[in-house]
Amino acid sequence: GCAQFFKGENDLSNLISLENGTIYISATETALHCYLFQAMEEFNSLYPNVRFKILNNSTTESVNAVKEGKVDLAFVSANLQVAKPLRMKILRKYHDILISGNRFGELKDDGKEVSLKELVSYPWISLTAETITRRFLNEYFEKNSLTFTPDMELATTDMILPAVRHNLGLGFIPAEFADAELKSGQVFEIKVKEKLPERNIILIYDMEYPQSIAAKEFQKFLKEKEM
């Protein structure tokens, strides 16, 4: 409707070429940190005049933004299926790690693996119950015959790291989020015996939606990046 018309009009006036194009993207936090920021940096070095307009949304909101024509592309971080005319493409895998602050230093044992059963009595930090990540963790605990009942629930992934750093509990986050704090020793990784499955960063787009020159070129760039 209106959103598509407004965006279409904006595209026509601005997207004569790659010299002044705009790419509209909806992305989850994890997709941004684990893939998209790096990809945009590389693309920007080739096409410095292309602008990005980024909405930071949940997976569900990002898929809906593509459906409604609000964005050209969505980058999400959950294993999901989409129905035509939407298409999805797996861009890369990523894995979550379990981290702790120094309050629970007894779990820092030179690479020794700890079972989930041993960890379940500790305080836990996680995302809220309606999120895909939380459902993923609930299933992981259930598969290991345990119930996941976090003591603290947060709205976004990037809030988990400071909460862990302040010794409020243990938390799973994508490895990329914790690099600096792991190196500085503010948090440490707990090796868990029961391996958490890898997850995917996924690109979603609408086959029937007319995309800008810049958005098409960005997709082509991402495809070549995989080779």
What residue spans do the PLM features occupy?
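Alpha-helical "hinge/linker" immediately C-terminal to small N-terminal DNA-binding modules
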Residues: 1-14
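Central regulatory/effector-binding core of bacterial HTH transcription factors
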Residues: 20-82, 154
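A late-sequence structural motif
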Residues: 35, 188-227
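Ligand-binding cleft/hinge of the Venus flytrap
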Residues: 39-48, 116, 134-147
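Hydrophobic hinge/microswitch elements
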Residues: 58-63, 67-71, 77, 136-189
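Flexible hinge/capping segments at coil-to-helix
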Residues: 85-124
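Short beta-strand->loop
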Residues: 87-97, 184-198
